């Protein structure tokens, strides 16, 4: 008895069993029936409109490289999706087309074939597309064929990003990558607000710790919301410890790898694109009208103490206002009495504050790129402009972004290649200084009985409209400058040495203003009002700040490939170092000579200045071993020895390993009779351990002494003295949070990857999270320091089908 007969006695007769063959084919035809019928209906209409055009009937047969009939192959007229057909059970098709039309024959995993329709019988042989079958996935410090990946990795190409009318990359990734969670931050809909990003949920609740993934742009940490989405070639998301462990303590909760476009050899190509976006507020709360609002208030008052908030006279005016029967001064919805506007329970307008504060806008984007080169040198230069506006109606809220990038790849000799990459990004964000999170919060707290304007047509002081339009600006300019250079040397065949140097400089400058604001009394005269609680009416202030971030990183690594028969080996090892520096300076002054020139020099009070300097550094040695046998049995081992300046002594260094394995079941000989139905089936599993050094405090082991300049409550020799307080207590035992996780799952593809999906079961343990220590007696005289004293565990079960997550269960403790 043969191996096939032992394992699958019924499947060996698959090709000979007509009934089963017809059932499978019928299922495929049912899957394709709707678009086919739609195309046929449309074609009939097209035929009526073109009776005078000469038609020919073209028939043919489509076979694969082995001479097997291909079922469900798409046959359509080029540039006319309404005229098409699909091949039947025997690979045959028939289509009526204009004479001389070009036919496109296509199928997933095969190269598209184009032929002329001349009314003759065609015999088409489809060739497998090696680029599709050998799809490459970007991983840490290299790439792998997708079929050989054993970690949890998802990839997004440029077509997905370009098809979405969004202004930044995080918006483009929403709903695209399973397990990638993007949520709106507390800053709400601010134009410069990126998304809060996590992979497979929150990974830590440790004090000062972050569970955000590491984001690398062409191998260097960067802000993905600032780069031009049009410049992106692909994005890889490394989800589990096996995939991300090569990056060590900077990536305990995954990695997002962004690769930008490169030039292609050939004639110079110029591409231009423009986008016009129409944006409108969505999912706004439906607020009560003033009549319902007043009735609820009165009912609450009666239930509480027997008193009503709105008098019967005001209730009558509320109803009349909504009916549009009020005339004269009452039509304004408010009255001036006893030296003030009678707002809230004394007003009778009917205002929907969400509709008043929001409106629809139009934004635009322009992109141009030039690329080309020879077989020795290729280049890519691109530029982009994006002008975006906020949805707030009052106060101009706008963000402008300029992108300029260039990339050169050069083959210097048979053994040496050079890559140089540069980017410049400028973002100008100009908005009302009052446009803070409190603004969004307060909209829902506004009473609908208050009108927008008083009886004289001036804005009332109960809403933020006056502050938004007249209270000053918050202007930020952010410049990012990336410089990257890479040298690749191949001293021997299949042995590569990589040297990468990266530098990123970010310059930020901001001016934040408080300008005098005024409402108007019953006679239309201006009256100074407080800009915000705690501010003196009529006061003014200007704050100017500047900060500069310098990031430097060095990557030195080497890899070696070796194939012995059906055994494939790849070994990689290297060194990584990072240095981050920040310098900041700010100044503030009040009581401007004139609000028309809001600068520090035009302030009249004592000038306040502040500044600082901080930095951190990381270093790590890493290695990886890959092995596969006939791309059937897969093994990967990673290790990284990491050091961080954020810890001290023997706590500074840590070793973090990971292991993963996979089995490509669909590459087994016994699977051949199933491969035209289930063409891909891979089982995989991984385990890994990573440290987390992403703490808020750069040096939590240092004692600090709070200081103050002339802030004492008494005088010495006629002056307020400088002060210094006792230092806090620190924990010398503070060390890494440790993230330990394992993942099992499988990937599958049906009908030559027409239908794809995956299943994952994932467990993550976060150990030694930083939290408060047990309280000590107050006689200690200081705050108890933070220590490593908390753990968290998460289970995730996820099922993905056709690129969509159809089931996700998350349990945390």
Identify the role of each PLM range.
Residues 1-404, 417-419, 482:
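Short, small/polar-rich motifs associated with maturation and membrane association
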Residues 94-95, 110, 118, 206, ...:
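Short, intrinsically disordered/low-complexity patches at protein termini
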Residues 97-103, 115-124, 218-232, 428-468, ...:
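Generic structural signal for short, solvent-exposed loop/turn connectors between secondary structure elements
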Residues 161, 211-212, 407-426, 460-514, ...:
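Extracellular/periplasmic, surface-exposed regions of secreted and cell-surface proteins
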Residues 163-165, 183, 196-198, 205, ...:
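Localized chelating/binding microdomains
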Residues 232, 383-385, 517-534, 775-776:
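A short glycine/small-residue-enriched secondary-structure motif
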Residues 285, 290-334, 418, 423-459, ...:
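A surface-exposed, glycine/aromatic-enriched loop/edge motif typical of exported proteins
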Residues 368-372, 452, 562:
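Short acidic-hydrophobic surface loop/beta-edge motif
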């Amino acid at each position: 008895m043969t191996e096939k007969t032992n394992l699958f006695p019924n499947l060996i007769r698959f090709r000979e069993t007509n009934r089963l063959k017809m059932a499978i084919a019928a299922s495929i035809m049912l899957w394709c029936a709707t678009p086919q019928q739609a195309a046929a209906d449309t074609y009939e209409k097209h035929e009526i409109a073109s009776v005078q055009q000469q038609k020919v009937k073209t028939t043919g047969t489509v076979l694969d490289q082995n001479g097997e009939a291909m079922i469900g192959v798409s046959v359509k007229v080029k540039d006319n999706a309404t005229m098409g057909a699909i091949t039947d059970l025997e690979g045959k098709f028939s289509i009526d087309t204009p004479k001389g039309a070009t036919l496109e024959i296509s199928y997933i995993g095969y190269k598209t074939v184009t032929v002329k329709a001349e009314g003759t019988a065609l015999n088409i042989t489809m060739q497998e597309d090696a680029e599709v079958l050998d799809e490459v996935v970007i991983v840490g410090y290299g790439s792998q064929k997708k079929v050989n990946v054993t970690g949890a990795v998802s990839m997004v190409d440029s077509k997905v990003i370009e098809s979405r009318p969004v202004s930044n990359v995080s918006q483009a990734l929403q709903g695209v990558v399973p397990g990638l969670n993007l949520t709106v931050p507390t800053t709400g809909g601010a134009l410069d607000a990126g998304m809060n990003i996590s992979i497979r949920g929150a990974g830590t609740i440790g004090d000062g710790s972050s569970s955000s993934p590491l984001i690398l742009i062409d191998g260097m940490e960067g802000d993905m919301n600032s780069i031009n989405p049009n410049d992106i070639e692909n994005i890889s998301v490394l989800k589990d410890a096996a995939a991300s462990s090569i990056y060590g303590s900077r990536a305990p909760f995954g990695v997002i790898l962004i690769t930008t476009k490169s030039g292609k050899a050939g004639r110079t190509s110029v591409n231009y694109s423009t986008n016009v976006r129409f944006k409108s507020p969505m999912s706004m709360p439906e607020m009560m009208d003033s009549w319902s609002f007043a009735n609820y208030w009165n009912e609450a008052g009666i239930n509480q103490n027997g008193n009503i908030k709105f008098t019967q006279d005001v209730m009558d005016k509320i109803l009349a206002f909504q009916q549009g029967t009020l005339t004269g001064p009452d039509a304004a919805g408010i009255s001036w009495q006893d030296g003030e506007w009678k707002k809230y329970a004394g007003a009778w307008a009917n205002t929907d504050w969400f509709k008043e504060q929001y409106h629809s806008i139009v934004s635009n984007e322009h992109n141009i790129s030039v690329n080309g080169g020879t077989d020795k040198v290729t280049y890519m230069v691109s530029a982009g402009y994006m002008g975006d506006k906020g949805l707030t109606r009052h106060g101009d809220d706008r963000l402008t972004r300029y992108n300029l990038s260039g990339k050169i790849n050069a083959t210097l000799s048979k053994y040496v290649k050079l890559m140089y990459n540069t980017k410049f990004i400028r973002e100008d964000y100009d908005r009302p200084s009052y446009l803070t999170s409190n603004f969004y919060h307060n909209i829902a707290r506004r009473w609908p009985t208050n009108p927008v304007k008083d009886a004289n047509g001036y804005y009332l002081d109960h809403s933020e409209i006056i502050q938004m339009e007249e209270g000053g600006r918050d202007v930020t300019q952010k410049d990012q400058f990336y410089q990257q250079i890479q040298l690749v040397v191949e001293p021997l065949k299949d042995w590569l040495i990589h040297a990468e140097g990266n530098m990123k400089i970010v310059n930020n400058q901001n001016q934040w203003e408080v300008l005098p604001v005024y409402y108007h009394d019953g006679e239309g005269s201006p009256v100074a009002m407080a800009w915000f609680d705690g501010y003196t009416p009529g006061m003014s202030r200007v704050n100017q700040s500047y900060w500069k971030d310098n990031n430097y990183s060095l990557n030195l690594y080497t890899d070696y490939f070796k194939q012995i028969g059906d055994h494939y080996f790849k070994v990689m090892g290297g060194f990584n170092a990072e240095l981050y520096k920040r310098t900041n300076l700010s100044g503030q002054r009040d009581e401007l000579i004139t609000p028309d020139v809001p600068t520090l020099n035009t302030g009249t009070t004592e000038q306040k200045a502040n500044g600082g300097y901080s930095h951190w550094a990381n270093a790590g040695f890493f290695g990886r071993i890959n092995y596969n046998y006939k791309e059937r049995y897969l093994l990967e081992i990673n290790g990284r020895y990491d050091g961080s300046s954020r810890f001290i002594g023997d706590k500074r260094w840590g070793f973090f390993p990971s292991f993963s394995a996979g089995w490509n079941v669909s590459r087994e000989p016994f699977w051949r009779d199933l491969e035209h139905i289930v063409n891909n089936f891979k089982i995989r599993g991984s385990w890994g351990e990573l440290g987390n050094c992403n703490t808020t405090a750069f040096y939590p082991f240092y004692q600090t002494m709070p200081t103050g300049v002339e802030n004492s409550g008494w005088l010495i020799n006629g002056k307020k003295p400088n002060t210094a307080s006792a230092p806090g207590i620190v924990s010398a035992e503070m060390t890494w949070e440790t993230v330990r996780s394992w993942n099992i799952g499988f990937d599958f593809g049906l009908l030559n990857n027409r239908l794809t999906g995956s299943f994952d079961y994932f467990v993550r343990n976060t150990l030694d999270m930083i939290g408060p220590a047990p309280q000590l007696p107050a006689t200690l005289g200081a705050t108890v320091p933070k220590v490593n004293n908390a753990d968290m565990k998460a289970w995730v079960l996820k099922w993905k089908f056709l690129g969509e997550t159809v089931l996700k269960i998350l349990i945390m403790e």
